[in-house]
A protein has these predicted regions:
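Mid-to-C-terminal Rossmann-like scaffold of FAD/NAD(P)H-dependent oxidoreductases
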Residues: 1, 8, 284-397, 428-432, ...
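Beta1-alpha1 glycine-rich phosphate/pyrophosphate-binding loop at the start
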Residues: 1-77, 117, 166-189, 328, ...
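Short hydrophobic core segments
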Residues: 6, 103-113, 156, 234-244, ...
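A Rossmann-like FAD-binding core segment of flavoenzymes
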Residues: 25-27, 69, 75-96, 103, ...
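Rossmann-like dinucleotide-binding cores of NAD(P)H-dependent redox enzymes
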Residues: 59, 152-153, 160-218, 298-304, ...
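Glycine-rich dinucleotide-binding loop and its adjacent helix/turn
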Residues: 110-172, 207, 261, 267-269, ...
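FAD-site-proximal beta/loop scaffold in flavoenzymes
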Residues: 125-149, 225, 233-313, 405, ...
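Rhodanese-like catalytic fold shared by cysteine-dependent sulfurtransferases
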Residues: 417-428, 432-469, 477-510, 514-564
Length: 564
């Protein structure tokens, strides 16, 4: 059997190694357009920033090492320009020599990945405008940074690559401005959770120009102007385009393969395309979203590697299936970690799913052990079935651990209530006896059993301020003085029982605290004294960050034990 693989990064490299492990006698040819294979795509921004010191650290394998270990014929700097499914051949152009030749195959695997989305804008040919996809792109940017020593940079786009590049450039002393049309960074997050990311970027000097449209670029001496639709141009020493990626599927289209959303390649669970003996994996393929069941594009290394393994199994006569992706991701931004899995509120609404959510601010580990850090956690679940839909966490230490637990729970099709039963490891340096994931389950359990009601930050302005409701802030006096919601009366939680006779049981009570814990306790107390009570999800901290994009959580102490 002869197998030809087009593309040698995540999906392609994973597949060829698996094919060899399954079939020692197969003839395997891997053709890669760039000069590198099996490189750490996700590490490219960190090489630009000097965090990864040596170029060799980016390449997990080389053509020589693949041959020595797996006897795989790797051909770099060669581009497949056409596929002939009827004759089972591909046309190959050797970029260095100019030679064009035909290669036969029994099985063909397409792993072309995705290419940076590059709009048709003027000035794209400027030597100071860059995109980042390949090792060659990375080397070009790093050379520019080392030689030209830019002081300012504009990043068009606020996705993973754009934000990682922003962090690395800032750490190198470059003043960075991010411009993008959407009004929030990191699309997998809801706008409220993205506010924490906005605050972190601004805290490190990154200027955010959100909701603005780039119309072109113009070279002006040793700088480049980024032209904006409704604002004055931005002058900088360099520009990096990071506005997203598009499936690189022109070969598949010309060969007559069925295409799906945004031109992606349609595959079944076996990673087979619409043409016999042609498989496809990675960022170029359309997948089924594990949560919604709808078709989606999910450009992540994890799914690409799994798909490569599955395609290899089936090429070698197996029967492996890819059951979809839920888009689990994590991102480091300065001292912050942002992570998500499953779907967010926007996606749930688009899918027509009736959902609810809880917001909490747990600590990364037991607060009496030094170094505990806070995180904002948001968990979505389906109202009727209580099926877990998604989660988003932003914070310091421990974010990655909790998002992976929640991703596993979603994959296992657990209900939100089953989070309470998870038996997770505990020691003071690592967690609390009730892990944050357990706590999310407890909160949902109380909501669904009617023990507590909640209202959300975007409903605060609609609260009755005409005296027909009691608005109560149960934080300490010091916290209240530093900032509070308009119209809310301060009665600290520990004093609440002494003031019950001052409250009207005929009026609904809306309670606020710093992070949602004390307001929950207040509602449990008030409910048992005959009041109808709701508490603010996420508390004043969440409201402040979302509405003003600056953190005020430092003004609170755990459970209100403030040192006055």
């Amino acid at each position: 059997m002869k197998v030809v693989i087009v593309g040698g990064v995540a999906g392609g490299a994973s597949a060829v190694a698996r094919i060899r492990r399954l079939d020692e006698h197969a003839q395997i040819v891997m053709i890669e357009r760039s000069g590198y294979i099996s490189y750490a795509n996700c590490g490219l921004p960190y090489y630009v920033g000097g965090v990864i010191k040596e170029q060799e650290e980016l390449t997990l394998q080389t053509p020589e090492s693949f041959w020595d270990r797996f006897r795989i014929d790797v051909r770099v700097r060669q581009e497949v320009t056409a596929i002939n499914p009827a004759e089972k051949t591909v046309t190959v152009h050797a970029l260095d020599s100019g030679k064009v030749y035909t290669e036969t195959y029994d099985k063909l695997l397409l792993a072309p990945g995705a290419k940076p989305t590059v709009p048709a804008l003027s000035g794209m040919d400027s030597e100071r405008v860059f995109t980042l996809r390949t090792v060659e792109d990375t080397l070009r940017i790093r050379r520019f940074v080392e030689d030209q020593k830019p002081k300012t940079a504009v990043l068009a786009g606020g996705g993973f690559i754009g934000l990682e590049m922003a962090e690395n450039l800032v750490e190198m002393g470059v003043s960075v401005t991010i411009v993008q049309r959407p009004k929030q960074l990191l699309a997998p997050l809801d706008a409220d959770m993205a506010s924490f990311v906005h605050a972190e970027m601004r805290r490190h000097g990154v200027a955010l120009r959100l909701g603005e449209t780039v119309t072109g670029f113009r070279q002006d001496g040793d700088s480049v102007l980024t032209l904006l639709e409704d604002s004055e141009p931005l002058r900088s020493d360099m520009v990096l385009l990071a506005i997203g990626v598009t499936p690189d599927t022109h070969l598949a289209k010309e060969a007559g393969l069925e295409l799906g959303i945004r031109g992606s390649i349609v595959v079944n669970e076996r990673m087979e395309t619409s043409v016999p003996d042609i498989y496809a994996v990675g960022d170029a393929v359309e997948v089924t979203h594990f949560v919604t069941g709808q078709k989606a594009l999910i450009s992540l290394a994890g799914p690409a590697n799994k798909q490569g393994r599955i395609a290899a199994d089936n090429i070698c006569g197996g029967n492996s299936h890819f059951h979809g992706s839920q888009g689990s991701s994590v991102l480091k931004l300065f001292s912050l970690t942002a992570a998500s899995t499953g779907i967010n509120e926007k996606a749930a609404q688009a899918a027509g799913i009736a959902y609810d959510r809880v917001v909490l601010f747990p600590a990364s580990h037991a607060t009496y052990y030094p170094g505990a850090q806070s995180m904002a956690m948001k968990v979505l679940y389906e109202k009727e079935s209580l099926r877990l839909l998604g989660a988003q966490i932003v914070g310091g230490e421990g974010v990655d651990k909790r998002i992976d637990v929640l991703a596993t729970a979603i994959r296992a099709k657990m209900t939100a209530l089953e989070l309470t039963e998870l038996d997770l490891s505990y020691a003071p340096p690592y967690s609390s006896a009730k892990d944050p994931v357990n706590m999310a389950g407890f909160m949902i359990e109380d909501l669904e059993s009617g023990k507590v009601r909640q209202f959300h930050w975007n409903e605060v302005e609609d609260l009755p301020c005409d005296g027909n409701a009691t608005l109560l802030d149960v934080r300490t006096e010091g916290e209240y003085r530093r900032g509070h919601l308009n119209g809310f009366r301060n009665i600290p939680l520990d004093d609440l029982r002494e003031h019950l006779d001052e409250l009207d049981r005929g009026k609904p009570v809306y309670v606020n605290c710093q992070t949602g814990l004390r307001s929950y306790l207040a509602c449990r107390l008030l409910t048992q004294y005959g009041f109808t009570c709701s508490h603010l999800s996420g508390g004043y901290s969440f409201y402040q960050v979302v509405t003003q994009e600056r953190q005020t959580a430092r003004s609170a102490y755990p459970c209100g034990m403030e040192k006055l």
